[in-house]
UniProtKB/Swiss-Prot annotation:
Involved in the ubiquitination and subsequent proteasomal degradation via the von Hippel-Lindau ubiquitination complex. Seems to act as a target recruitment subunit in the E3 ubiquitin ligase complex and recruits hydroxylated hypoxia-inducible factor (HIF) under normoxic conditions. Involved in transcriptional repression through interaction with HIF1A, HIF1AN and histone deacetylases. Ubiquitinates, in an oxygen-responsive manner, ADRB2. Acts as a negative regulator of mTORC1 by promoting ubiquitination and degradation of RPTOR. This is von Hippel-Lindau disease tumor suppressor. Disulfide bonds: none annotated. The Elongin BC complex binding domain is also known as BC-box with the consensus [APST]-L-x(3)-C-x(3)-[AILV]. It comes from Mus musculus. One of its GO terms (biological process) is endothelial cell differentiation. It comes from the Eukaryota. It is a peripheral membrane protein. Belongs to the VHL family. Pathway: Protein modification; protein ubiquitination. The keyword Transferase does not apply. It is found in: Cytoplasm; Cell membrane; Endoplasmic reticulum; Nucleus.
Length: 181
């Protein structure tokens, strides 16, 4: 994962000259190459098999080895790296330390940072969709005697990319609100 040091534009999350030339700004959510190590322990405190995803320097999710329920793993990460956690089978979103994104901080006195992965409180509708998806084959969704909008909801599977887009939009909106007088 070696890479050149971040320019001031990159560090600020703004497009740098290379990205502007290519006509594509860098993604809002991406890891920063701080080169400051952080020892982290991922603790799967959920009943699900967890897939850790590191958002690389280009904002692309990179899968790491799965964590079975009730297990943990020491990870050598860096300050400013972004991590998401998903159910390995369904890609349902999970929480880490009560939030959707985990960003390691610097270790204090050599102690590792704990990333406690838990289930969120899903809405009743979300949980019902999860259960129906687990019991019914996708080709049989439209055979169910339910309202049409639920067919579409069932077919709208959890997606890491959609979540990254949503989190990016939320980040931009919160920055915009902070800038207003």
């Amino acid at each position: 994962m070696p890479r050149k040091a971040a320019s001031p534009e990159e560090a600020a999350g703004e497009p740098g000259p290379e990205e502007m030339e290519a006509g594509r700004p860098r993604p809002v959510l991406r890891s920063v190459n701080s080169r400051e190590p952080s020892q982290v322990i991922f603790c799967n405190r959920s009943p699900r098999v967890v897939l850790p995803l590191w958002l690389n320097f280009d904002g692309e999710p990179q899968p790491y080895p799965i964590l079975p329920p009730g297990t943990g793993r020491r990870i050598h990460s860096y300050r400013g790296h972004l991590w998401l956690f998903r159910d390995a089978g369904t890609h349902d979103g999970l929480l880490v330390n009560q939030t959707e994104l985990f960003v390691p901080s610097l270790n204090v006195d050599g102690q590792p940072i704990f990333a406690n992965i838990t289930l969120p409180v899903y809405t009743l509708k979300e949980r019902c969709l999860q259960v129906v998806r687990s019991l019914v084959k996708p080709e049989n969704y439209r055979r169910l005697d339910i309202v049409r909008s639920l067919y579409e909801d069932l077919e709208d599977y959890p997606s890491v990319r959609k979540d990254i887009q949503r989190l990016s939009q939320e980040h931009l909106e919160s920055q915009h609100l902070e800038e207003e007088p």
